[in-house]
C-alpha cells in the first residue's frame, strides 16, 4: 500500500534532520533567528540545503524522566512535520528548558505553534533585509 501524495509531503525523513555535530555547530555558533519562552528555545539559521531541517536537544538535566523527554521530542517533531511547508529553508534546533516536563501535551503543541509562527516572521524579516547575492 503506497502513501498518497498528500501524505508524502508531510513526511519527516532523514534529510530533514540535523544529525551530527557538523550540522548543529553552525546553528549554535550563529543563530540570527531565535524564538523562545520560559520552557522552549528555538535557534535557527538560514539553510543552504533548500529545506527546513530540525535538530533536538533535550537534556536529562532539564527533563528528568525519559518518558517526558520522549514525549517532548515526539511533539516537537510532529509540530515541525506539520509546519514544514510554511517554514523557509532553515536549520532549526529545539532546546528544552527547565519546566518543560510540567507542561501538558496540549500546552506543548500550542507553544510550538506560536514559536514556529515567530520563527517564520523573523526569517521573513531577515531575508528581506539581506541583500541579494549575485554570483
Curated annotation (Swiss-Prot):
InterPro entries reported for this sequence: Ribosomal_Su5_D2-typ_SF, Ribsml_uS5_D2-typ_fold_subgr, RNase_P, RNase_P_CS
GO biological process, one term: tRNA 5'-leader removal
Reaction it catalyzes: Endonucleolytic cleavage of RNA, removing 5'-extranucleotides from tRNA precursor
Coiled-coil blocks: none
EC number, as in UniProt: 3.1.26.5
Gene Ontology CC terms, in alphabetical order: ribonuclease P complex
PANTHER family in the cross-refs: RIBONUCLEASE P PROTEIN COMPONENT
Listed NCBIfam families: rnpA (TIGR00188)
Name of the protein described by the UniProt record: Ribonuclease P protein component
Source species of the chain: Saccharophagus degradans (strain 2-40 / ATCC 43961 / DSM 17024)
Gene: rnpA
